[in-house]
Amino acid sequence: MGFFKGLSSRPTPKQVAKDRLKLILIHDRGEIPTDTLEKIRKEILGVISKYIEIQVDDVEISVNKSEDMEGENTSALIASIPIKSIRR
């Protein structure tokens, strides 16, 4: 069955989630609009909840801005997602 795994042109859910999280790591000096941040939150929670039961009411997502060693402004999306249990 491992042979057929490489023939699929569709990305795995794991790869989709990884790609989405990469996109969220923002290298932008501008602010993220509230509605965009909410869309990101819903999409991340949708993907994660397929594999893990989470406490949706206690999820915290924020954007932290800092300066890197070269003096560039960087932004990072920080997510705190409490886990109830892992789906098997």
UniProtKB/Swiss-Prot annotation:
Q: Which UniProt keywords apply?
A: Cell cycle, Cell division
Statement: the UniProt record of this protein carries the keyword Cell division: yes
Q: Which residues belong to the signal peptide in this entry? A: none
* Gene3D superfamilies reported in the protein's UniProt record: Cell division topological specificity factor MinE
| BP GO annotations | cell division; regulation of division septum assembly
Specify whether Cell division is a keyword of the entry: yes
Note the Pfam families from the entry.
Answer: MinE
State the InterPro entries in the record.
MinE, MinE_sf
The cross-references to SUPFAM superfamilies, in alphabetical order and at most eight, read:
Cell division protein MinE topological specificity domain
* Chain's role: Prevents the cell division inhibition by proteins MinC and MinD at internal division sites while permitting inhibition at polar sites. This ensures cell division at the proper site by restricting the formation of a division septum at the midpoint of the long axis of the cell.
Which family does this protein fall into?
Belongs to the MinE family.
* Entry protein name: Cell division topological specificity factor
